[in-house]
Amino acid sequence: MRSIIEVLDRAKAVQKVRSDYKLSLTLGIGESSLSSYRRGLVLPDEINCIKLAAAMHEDPALLVAEMQAQRAKTPELKKLWSGIAKRLTLHPC
């Protein structure tokens, strides 16, 4: 499962931008939001997961599942979302 930092770095690479500022402009996500993601203060919501996934040319469901697993507050929810992410990785839509 990828960290949000790995996701942001991949989105920057795919979009061929060097800074989070440029990525924020490309995605239409506030620079302060991207900064909060990178610093580990919050994880992106579903709408911003969709934008990030589109920037990486990936299935948004996978990124949503990965972020939900990371924000899960119980072991059961973490296991559920991790399992969904794993299945989406093995059997992409």
Describe the predicted segments one by one:
Residues 30, 41, 67-71:
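The DNA-recognition helices of helix-turn-helix-type DNA-binding domains
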Residues 35-36, 50, 64:
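Key DNA-contacting residues within the recognition helix of helix-turn-helix
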Residues 32-35, 42, 61:
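Key DNA-contact positions within bacterial/archaeal DNA-binding proteins
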Residues 15-36:
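Short alpha-helical DNA-recognition segment
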